[in-house]
């Protein structure tokens, strides 16, 4: 059986990842592909339980190190129960956030040691990494305004503009270091333009 494709979507709060994932999923399904849409933290029952601990409560509820450990506990369950089985059956797995979110949120944003995050990646991911990562980029203040207007994961939104500016810089640095995997998409553009840009990249990179 043909191995599937693992595509992750990354970006700060209010970047529009969920909308763009849904649009890409609809296009791929219409073309006859088996598509799994999932998210992190979460995606499996165990990981969703951990998600509740992570996204609710005060901004300082967890330290960056503790957050990283919780994220990776959820991620491992998600990989074992959803991502790997999906890829094994040949599906296109579209994931709203993956390991780069830990690098950006807990690393660049929260100062968790890079050595800790690297060790977690090595031992937990076990080679399960996206073949393509789409980083939806926009100014931090614009993203926060969008997120506030829609409601949502208030714990991370409440961390303040400086945190989210570090977060954005962290994502752009990931893209700079890993251009073969990562593509930056201008998420401050019109909705349809963002969709078209994503579709173009997926066609060019993966032929989907």
UniProtKB/Swiss-Prot annotation:
Transmembrane regions listed in the UniProt entry: none
Top EC class for this record: transferase
Record InterPro entries: P-loop_NTPase (IPR027417), Thymidylate_kin-like_dom (IPR039430), Thymidylate_kin_CS (IPR018095), Thymidylate_kinase (IPR018094)
Residues where ATP binds: 11-18
Catalytic activity, EC: 2.7.4.9
Annotated GO MF terms: ATP binding; dTMP kinase activity
Keywords: ATP-binding, Kinase, Nucleotide biosynthesis, Nucleotide-binding, Transferase
Short name of one Pfam family: Thymidylate_kin
A Gene Ontology BP annotation from the UniProt entry: dTDP biosynthetic process
Cellular-component GO terms for this entry: cytosol
Catalytic activity: dTMP + ATP = dTDP + ADP
The family this protein is said to belong to: Belongs to the thymidylate kinase family.
Function according to Swiss-Prot or TrEMBL: Phosphorylation of dTMP to form dTDP in both de novo and salvage pathways of dTTP synthesis.
Name of the protein: Thymidylate kinase
């Amino acid at each position: 059986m043909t191995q599937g494709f693992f595509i992750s979507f990354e970006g700060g709060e209010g970047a529009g990842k969920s909308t763009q994932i849904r649009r890409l999923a609809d296009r791929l399904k219409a073309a006859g592909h088996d598509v799994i849409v999932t998210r992190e933290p979460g995606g499996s029952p165990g990981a969703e339980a951990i998600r509740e601990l992570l996204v609710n409560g005060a901004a300082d509820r967890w330290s960056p190190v503790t957050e990283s450990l919780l994220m990776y506990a959820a991620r491992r369950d998600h990989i074992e129960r959803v991502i790997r089985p999906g890829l094994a059956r040949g599906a296109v797995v579209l994931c709203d956030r993956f390991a780069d979110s830990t690098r950006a949120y807990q690393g660049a944003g929260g100062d968790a040691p890079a050595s800790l995050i690297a060790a977690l990646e090595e031992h937990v991911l076990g080679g399960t990494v996206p073949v393509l990562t789409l980083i939806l980029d926009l100014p931090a203040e614009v993203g926060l305004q969008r997120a506030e207007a829609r409601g949502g994961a208030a714990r991370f939104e409440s961390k303040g503009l400086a945190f989210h500016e570090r977060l954005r810089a962290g994502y752009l640095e990931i893209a700079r270091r890993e251009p073969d995997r990562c593509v930056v998409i201008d998420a401050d553009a019109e909705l349809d333009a963002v969709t078209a840009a994503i579709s173009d990249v997926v066609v060019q990179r993966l032929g989907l």
